[in-house]
């Protein structure tokens, strides 16, 4: 990975995860800057990873080859306005803010950007993230490769060909950890109802989930349906549980939930 100068505008949990992954993989800490108005936000990054931090967004972005916008969507316009004075011609801009499309970011920074939009998810904080990426047609393969390598510091990446695909990434991966948490919550609650204490119920559920996910990852050529069928004996307990799920249309519920996530993402784009 080319060791460009990176400026993270923002210093939240996702920035911390990316910086941690980069430094752990040998990226020079002196080439990384993170900005935040609060010293309480900046200091831990400086102390833990040896990177530079500052409250001066303009200086950090001016000196950088790559500018990563990592602020809340509702704050983006205010953060970008002072940055309009910067010449972004030879810079790569990466946005990890939800709900703000490429055209809107061009408007916010008053220029046509070399821009990659990224939609990560929270397991990135453990290096197990899944990020969707989109780049307009004028962005070079070189810049796209750098953006992908940046996000591979915290997990896997998937490119989408149309910007609308970012909203589909939100439904399939960005919001997905919460789906699994909800399912696990329901299982834990029923295990408690059946007599387990809270800690034992959680252990049973989390280890089953970890094992199932690990089996998926360890068998990339095996269809998910085949893995399910391999656990299901005709007339057995698993078959009866799955029959109950199907009777209550679990697949339809999942589809409707993912469609609702996409619809909400589309609505959010109109807000900013």
From Swiss-Prot:
Highest classification ranks of the organism: Bacteria, Pseudomonadati, Pseudomonadota, Gammaproteobacteria, Vibrionales
Record Gene3D superfamilies: NAD(P)-binding Rossmann-like Domain (3.40.50.720), ProC C-terminal domain-like (1.10.3730.10)
Enzyme class: oxidoreductase
Signal peptide: none
Principal cellular location given in the protein's record: cytoplasm
Highest taxon in the source lineage: Bacteria
EC number(s) recorded for this UniProt protein: 1.5.1.2
InterPro entries on file: 6-PGluconate_DH-like_C_sf, NAD(P)-bd_dom_sf, P5C_Rdtase_cat_N, P5CR-like_CS, P5CR_dimer, Pyrroline-COOH_reductase
Keywords noted in UniProt: Amino-acid biosynthesis, Cytoplasm, NADP, Oxidoreductase, Proline biosynthesis
Species of the source: Vibrio alginolyticus
Claim: Repressor is one of the keywords in the record: no
GO biological process: L-proline biosynthetic process
Function of the molecule: Catalyzes the reduction of 1-pyrroline-5-carboxylate (PCA) to L-proline.
UniProt-recorded name of the protein: Pyrroline-5-carboxylate reductase
GO molecular function, one term: pyrroline-5-carboxylate reductase activity
UniProt pathway: Amino-acid biosynthesis; L-proline biosynthesis; L-proline from L-glutamate 5-semialdehyde: step 1/1
Family as reported in the entry's similarity comment: Belongs to the pyrroline-5-carboxylate reductase family.
GO CC aspect terms: cytoplasm
Catalytic activity line of the entry: L-proline + NADP(+) = (S)-1-pyrroline-5-carboxylate + NADPH + 2 H(+); L-proline + NAD(+) = (S)-1-pyrroline-5-carboxylate + NADH + 2 H(+)
Subcellular location: Cytoplasm
């Amino acid at each position: 990975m080319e060791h460009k100068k990176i400026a993270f505008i923002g210093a939240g949990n996702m920035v911390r995860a990316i910086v941690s992954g980069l430094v752990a993989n040998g990226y020079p800490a002196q080439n990384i800057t993170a900005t935040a108005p609060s010293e309480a936000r900046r200091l831990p990054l400086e102390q833990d990873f040896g990177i530079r931090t500052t409250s001066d967004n303009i200086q950090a972005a001016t000196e950088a080859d790559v500018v990563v916008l990592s602020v809340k969507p509702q704050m983006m316009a205010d953060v970008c306005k002072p940055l309009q004075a910067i010449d972004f011609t030879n810079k790569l801009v990466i946005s990890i803010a939800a709900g703000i499309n490429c055209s809107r970011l061009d408007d916010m920074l008053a220029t046509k950007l070399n821009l990659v939009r990224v939609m990560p998810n929270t397991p990135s904080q453990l290096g197990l993230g899944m990020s969707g990426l989109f780049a307009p047609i004028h962005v070079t393969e070189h810049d796209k490769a750098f953006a992908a390598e940046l996000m591979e510091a915290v997990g896997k990446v998937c490119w989408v060909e149309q910007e609308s695909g970012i909203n589909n990434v939100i439904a399939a991966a960005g919001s997905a950890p919460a789906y699994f948490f909800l399912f696990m919550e329901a299982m834990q609650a029923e295990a408690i109802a059946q007599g387990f204490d809270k800690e034992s119920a959680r252990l049973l559920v989390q280890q089953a989930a970890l094992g199932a996910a690990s089996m998926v990852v360890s068998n990339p050529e095996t269809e998910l349906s085949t893995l399910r069928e391999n656990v299901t004996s005709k007339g057995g307990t698993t078959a009866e549980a799955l029959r109950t799920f199907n009777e209550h249309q679990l697949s339809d519920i999942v589809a409707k939930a993912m469609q609702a996530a996409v619809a909400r993402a589309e609505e959010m784009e109109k807000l900013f």
